[in-house]
Amino acid sequence: YYLLRGIPSYEDGDFSTEKFEARYNADLANNLGNLVSRVAVLIEKLFNGSFAYSRKYVLKEVDDKVINTWKKYIESLDNFKLHLALENVFSLADFANLFVDEHKPWALGDNPEHLNEVMTNLIVILLNVAWLLKPFLPETSNRIFEVLGADKDGKSWEEKPFQVRPKILFPKIQ
């Protein structure tokens, strides 16, 4: 991951243990791992571990962000700019973390409609992040699907509730 994310294709790069640990902690532990954990724990606490996803709750802002991310991702892959493809994936994860902070789902217990909307949008983002990561981090992608209790093929996401299994994906390197 570090080499793909941190060093542009066809260019020289610099590797150090310190840079590796910093990238791992920033991208994987703090950003992605924390996001997956936050969403799973929220579903566990607010929905007793089972969440029924519904496409009707997906916001245009989120839909546009996901579509735009896929377009940039594919363009980056077409141009062999793997570091930019991963940058787009983590930009989507950043967006989701800001979405959590902005909408504060833990405080929406008295507004179930808005809570469903917020959690649906977070699920949509995480499912797309998992798919986007598949070529680069296939095990991580599978673990995200597993934590969310989502089918890896995406065929039945709206047919049955997600059964979350919260766990830490990336422990921090100290």
Q: Which residue stretches match the model-derived regions?
A:
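Conserved, charged catalytic cores of large soluble enzymes
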Residues: 10, 36-73, 97-112
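Residues that form generic nucleotide/phosphate-binding pockets
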Residues: 2, 23, 65, 69, ...
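A short, ordered amphipathic alpha-helix with a cationic face
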Residues: 6, 59-63, 117-120, 132
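Extended, non-catalytic structural segments that build the interaction scaffolds
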Residues: 14-28, 68-87
